[in-house]
């Protein structure tokens, strides 16, 4: 594939660092915000509401890299080398933010890295805040497909995450049988580990600006109060997206939605 030369990569990295830190000011007590959730769960939206913080997102780096190369992100060009380079750039942004004692928002779907970061940053005087994005897995899946049809690259990330961790099984949160799961297996496991390690956390329902649960709240009451989406509404939305994909000649999107509908019908 087309790629930047070594000196061009250095220029690109410096530009990304400068853009990430632009307009941000140091903090006497800097905070590291870790945002956790599957693709399509609203992490980027929540990140945009946190003031005066350097956002670290490999997905954003990859998108900017594609623009620099003049590649259409719809072609899903990302390969392993691009992913590694995005990690290198993200690390440079992180080091610059820490050096300047700036607040940091860590936006990622790579869950295994998050605990490492939460353990690492306090050494540099950072307090940590863990924010979990709770979203119905079918809602997230359709968000991702819709974003792909809006020329976003999220579909491939979502597919990779689901292939790695698989579909959730059972009913871990005690949901009613006519509704779909509210967390993926990966995020659920992450939450359990976070609690075991003693990390205070906040849980956000999709589309809400304020947390629905904070450490110390009654978790059972939180579960009872969740605003679940009936399967019928998922199926209605899926049909609309299928028609849109069909009319646009997007065969891959159409087949993805067909498979999603089949699974929803089986769980209805």
Where are these regions (language model features)?
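Conserved GTP-binding G-domain of TRAFAC-class P-loop NTPases and closely related GTPase folds
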Residues: 142-268
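Phosphate-binding P-loop
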Residues: 22-30, 97-98
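Conserved phosphate-donor/acceptor-positioning beta-strand/loop module used by diverse small-molecule
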Residues: 122-145
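Conserved nucleotide-sensing/catalytic segment adjacent to the nucleotide-binding pocket
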Residues: 54-55, 60-119
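N-terminal pre-Walker A segment at the start of P-loop NTPase domains
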Residues: 1-26
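Hydrophobic positions on the alpha1 helix immediately C-terminal to the Walker A/P-loop
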Residues: 46
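Conserved glycine(s) of the Walker
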Residues: 42
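The conserved Walker
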Residues: 38-39
């Amino acid at each position: 594939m087309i790629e930047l030369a070594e000196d061009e990569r250095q220029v690109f990295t410096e530009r990304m660092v400068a853009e990430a830190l632009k307009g941000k000011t140091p903090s006497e007590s800097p905070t590291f915000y870790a945002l956790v959730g599957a693709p399509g769960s609203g992490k980027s939206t929540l990140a945009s509401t946190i003031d005066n913080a350097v956002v670290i997102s490999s997905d954003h780096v990859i998108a900017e890299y594609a623009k620099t190369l003049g590649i259409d992100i719809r072609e899903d060009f990302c390969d392993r080398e691009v992913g590694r380079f995005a990690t290198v750039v993200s690390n440079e942004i992180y080091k610059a933010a820490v050096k300047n004692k700036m607040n940091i928002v860590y936006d990622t779907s790579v869950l295994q890295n998050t605990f490492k970061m939460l353990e690492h940053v306090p050494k540099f005087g950072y307090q940590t805040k863990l924010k979990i994005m709770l979203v119905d897995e079918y809602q997230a899946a359709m968000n991702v497909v819709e974003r792909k049809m809006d020329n976003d690259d999220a579909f491939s990330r979502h597919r990779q995450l689901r292939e790695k961790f698989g579909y959730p099984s059972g009913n871990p949160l005690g949901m009613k049988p006519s509704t779909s799961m509210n967390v993926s297996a990966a995020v659920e496991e992450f939450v359990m580990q976070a609690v075991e390690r003693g990390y205070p956390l906040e849980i956000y329902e999709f589309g809400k600006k304020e947390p629905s649960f904070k450490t110390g709240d009654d978790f059972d009451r939180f579960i009872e109060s969740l605003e679940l989406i009936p399967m019928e509404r998922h199926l209605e939305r899926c049909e609309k997206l299928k028609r849109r994909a069909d009319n646009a000649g997007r065969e891959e999107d159409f087949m993805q939605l067909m498979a999603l509908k089949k699974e929803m019908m089986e769980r209805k």
